[in-house]
């Protein structure tokens, strides 16, 4: 395509890469601790298994305990466990899930828009090294999405995301080079077409 001198090329747009604000980053770094307003709180804290207990609540079936598989569950015990994970805990957990969904969608949209812009330019060849750069960014974003999943599954964990700004800057620099080449070709084409028009208009 680069050797095609009869048609112009579209410039490449580099969309903004998804990032989390400081407040969201702090939430990821902060262990989500269950409430102390339950007689079971100290026991769970000593065991260090709040995440395990929280996940087990989803498997409660009538009186059968999901932890020991015995018929040991009654309403008082179930309320005591539920009280460990109070409204504040549930709201923070919902915040984490919202962060994951928004970040995951933004990552997918970023890669999709970038690839579309490269294809739409009509200039970038399949073997251009920019595709490898995009793959690296995609891999780092995928690792971040997995880290956010881990935070949801283990709210007591403290996590931080990989800084992909270096990869982003490399892609940005590459796109500037490609756009410079595209502009040069388009300028030459426009100059050629202008010359042809001037010549033919005088005939």
Question: Where is each model-derived feature located?
Answer:
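"flanking P-loop NTPase cores in genome-maintenance ATPases
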Residues: 1-62, 69-203
């Amino acid at each position: 395509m680069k050797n095609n001198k009869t048609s112009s090329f579209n410039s490449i747009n580099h969309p903004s890469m998804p990032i989390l604000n400081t407040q969201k980053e702090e939430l990821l770094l902060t262990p989500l601790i269950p409430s102390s307003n339950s007689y079971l709180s100290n026991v769970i804290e000593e065991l260090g298994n709040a995440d395990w207990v929280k996940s087990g609540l989803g498997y409660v079936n009538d009186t059968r305990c999901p932890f020991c598989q015995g018929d040991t569950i009654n309403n008082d015990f179930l309320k005591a466990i539920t009280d460990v994970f109070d409204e504040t805990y549930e709201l923070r957990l919902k915040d984490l899930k919202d962060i994951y969904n928004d970040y995951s969608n933004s990552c997918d949209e970023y890669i999709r828009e970038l690839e579309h812009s490269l294809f739409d330019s009509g200039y970038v060849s399949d073997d251009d090294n920019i595709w490898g750069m995009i793959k690296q960014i995609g891999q780092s974003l995928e690792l971040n999405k997995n880290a956010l999943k881990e935070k949801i599954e283990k709210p007591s964990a403290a996590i931080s995301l990989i800084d992909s700004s270096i990869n982003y800057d490399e892609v940005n620099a590459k796109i500037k080079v490609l756009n410079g080449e595209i502009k040069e070709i388009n300028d030459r084409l426009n100059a050629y077409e202008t010359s042809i028009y001037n010549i033919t208009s005088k005939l």
